[in-house]
């Protein structure tokens, strides 16, 4: 808790609520605090301490920022004191179990409380935490607007941090949209393999009847040599395709040639 100290008198509403809080009876403590804050005068010595304890319990219960803001605006008739705002923000940031939606509510409302933040003696510790929080929920525009209104050394360094974070997010987004080259290469290799298999199958289908005829023409050795030359050429073509990355021809060029060859023999 930011500024509430251990009460010496447990007989006061605040003291008794604090005792219940220490004992882990948060709901009972919150009930007493609510009643006290509704009926007490804002100028009472323990009023601010009671309110901070109330906010602490609500944060531990992960109540929304909007709910706490409504309570504070009601208790202070629409004008929350700067000291309460600062304690409220610190208490909220100290709880790491809020959802992104909870933190987004806080970030979106900060511009209304920028004067309290920038004038606070705790500004140097609050602003970096707020920037980290804003970056974590990818909601940096409200913080950039606040920092731009107080261009000190700290504010400038935090603006640069936000800019770097935004550029990193942009690069990651572009990288996620870019196809993986290894996947494209694998798909291309599979396509060539299937096409080459089809070429080989068509060649074999054409060679079978031709070879049966050549058995009757023993003297025509040149034709047999030409046929084996075609087969050797196909194996060389397969070798060139497998090394297409090192060749002057691109893989797309080899694919085009293979398509034309397949069209010619089919």
From Swiss-Prot:
Species this protein is from: Schizosaccharomyces pombe (strain 972 / ATCC 24843)
Alphabetical UniProt keywords: Phosphoprotein
GO molecular function: protein-membrane adaptor activity
Protein name (record): Uncharacterized protein C16C4.04
Chain positions with Phosphoserine modification: 176
One of the GO BP terms on file: protein import into peroxisome matrix, receptor recycling
Residues recorded with modification Phosphothreonine: 178
GO cellular component, one term: peroxisomal membrane
